[in-house]
């Protein structure tokens, strides 16, 4: 498997997590929508499924990891940033085969692609604190 396949899976997973957070729709429905309506060329579909389902089912546990390091209430964190941080927290916690530097770098790149101008700095700082705590 090429690293770019995982990168594309992360990108799709962040979009699905974002959609799920905002819509409140059933996890299976959101996953089905993304798997049938998005281009899956070069996407590690199994990894996408794991990331999306993992974040959705372990949201509370993941939030508890980074909430102590927030500089504001979680309700004030943008939905895009929450989706990215939850995905990275999942990889850092449950995917020991993914080096922490890779998980953080991928999250920063996602924040640059989808977040506001300074999102990548927020995501980087928060994940650095999360890793330092481990």
From Swiss-Prot:
Annotated Gene Ontology cellular component terms: cytosol
Top-level taxon of origin: Bacteria
UniProt xrefs under Pfam families: NusB (PF01029)
Single annotated GO MF: RNA binding
HAMAP family: NusB
Family classification: Belongs to the NusB family.
Protein name listed in UniProt: Transcription antitermination protein NusB
Phylogenetic lineage: Bacteria, Pseudomonadati, Pseudomonadota, Gammaproteobacteria, Alteromonadales
Gene expressing this chain: nusB
């Amino acid at each position: 498997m090429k690293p770019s396949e995982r990168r594309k899976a992360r990108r799709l997973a962040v979009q699905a997590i974002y959609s799920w957070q905002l819509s409140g729709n059933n996890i299976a429905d959101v996953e089905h929508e993304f798997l049938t309506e998005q281009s899956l060329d070069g996407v590690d579909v199994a990894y996408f499924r794991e990331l999306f389902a993992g974040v959705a089912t372990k949201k509370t546990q993941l939030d508890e990891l980074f909430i102590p390091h927030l500089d504001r209430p979680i309700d004030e964190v943008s939905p895009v940033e929450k989706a990215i941080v939850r995905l990275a927290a999942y990889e850092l916690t449950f995917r020991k085969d993914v080096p922490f530097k890779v998980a953080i770098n991928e999250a920063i790149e996602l924040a640059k692609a989808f977040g506001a101008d300074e999102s990548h700095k927020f995501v980087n700082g928060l994940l650095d604190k999360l890793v330092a705590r481990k």
